[in-house]
Amino acid sequence: MDIWKPEIKYLRYTNGFNVSELEDACFKFNYKFPKVGYCRVPSHAWCRNQGSFCATLTLYGKSKHYDKYFGVITGFTAFANTVEEAVNKLVFLAVDFITWRRQELNVYG
């Protein structure tokens, strides 16, 4: 089987479904505004058994000066049989990670 990953040129972006919850978390904890993309998974891809659609997001950090970004913190990919399920799963994972990371960083000051 060929290795497959979502490519930027094939992604469509959305702010529907529960993306507003993710936008709120990113704004609250000082991350770059999220761009959630989704695409159809090809039938020959190794991950097709995970679902027909893929949603993806790369999380970027922001500096305290608000004009520079730290760069990539992590990336998220979620698979499901509908676009809505994939995006909702991605938003849940990303918001959960953002709140977990905030709690862990607060432990160290």
Swiss-Prot record:
Pfam families: Corona_NS12-7. It comes from the Viruses. InterPro entries: Corona_NS2. Changing residue 43 to I: In strain: Isolate BCQ.7373. Transmembrane segments: none annotated. Changing residue 5 to R: In strain: Isolate Yoo. Belongs to the coronaviruses ns12.7 protein family. This is Non-structural protein of 12.7 kDa. It comes from Bovine coronavirus (strain Quebec). The lineage of its organism: Viruses, Riboviria, Orthornavirae, Pisuviricota, Pisoniviricetes.
